[in-house]
Amino acid sequence: LHSSPKVTAPLPLWDMLEGTAPRGLLGLSDPNVHRVGDRWSLFVGGFSTSFRNRLYRADLPAGEDVRLTGWRLRTTAGGRPVPLVPDPPRGSWDAGGMHTPCYVPPHRGAPARVYYAGRRGRRHYGPGSAYAVGVLEQRPDGSWSRAAHPVATGTPDRPSALEPAVVPVADGYRMWFLSAPHEVGPGEQPDFELRASDSPDGIVWSRPRTFASRREGFFDTALYHGPDGWTMLLARGTDLHGTSPFPEQGLWAMRADTPSADRADWSPPVRVLDTGAPATPRWMGRGVCGPSVARTADGGLLVFFTGTHDSRSWWREAAARIAALRRPPVPAPYFLATGGARLEPAGRAGR
């Protein structure tokens, strides 16, 4: 028997609608939190004021315990956010932008890496949007280099591979990723399938196999290890465009003794967050995605994620703020907020 976690006390950190993104950025999404050396670091995707999707890093002060607040984005002396790497060359497979970082520490003689979803063209969503999984490797001086080619791509019937979640295992690396025709556009229903793949070196990957079906509709995942085994959190990707009807949103949890790529080794998914519940904060009212879990020094768990605001059109949001003598939000088709919550044990779930 394993305890089922419960998400409590959600808190936004960076919010597009409220204008709390750091200077030089319009929004941040898909946080990935790890202890790196003497400090906690948060790798995150960001949309710059120059309209570029880049990867960034925020930190807590050295020696401090992980918490939801107090993260400082790495910046220049002038206060401008510093991306992990320069923009990809024009015409490259990820020239449209870099999203959804996943940090993996040094393993089996390989350096630290950041896997990410690279977008080919300008389209973020809908037919014609296309993604593949790429990787950055850390140099001895701490800087990052971008691999010229993707490590995972789609198939003719499902051209996009995105949302990588990579963990080191005894014989190499294991990756879960989203297989989809494209990112969901306005009025569309999601067509999501999670797949799993293995690699001895983290670069050349095995033929992927289905881990979660299209019927289940999971968009991305995060794994963490605890005293009673492994937990996988799964999200459905959020209702970006306010489409109705749309699959129920939130977070689900499964348990296993090992980070197995075989779905039969995992318990049935149990819903641990219902973002359709009446008390849900508005900043995550249309669902959450990009989960990442960190353990505090006293054994508590924090889950970081990105929520989609249950918002009105930009025009209506802007009018309401102007009427209240507040600055209007940045023009956007939807509004994201990145934050987190506590992940508390609650109840028991059987395997």
Question: What is each model feature region?
Answer:
Residues 1-96, 104-162, 167-219, 225-284, ...:
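Beta-rich carbohydrate-recognition and catalytic domains
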Residues 286-288:
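Intrinsically disordered, low-complexity, Lys/Arg-biased terminal tails
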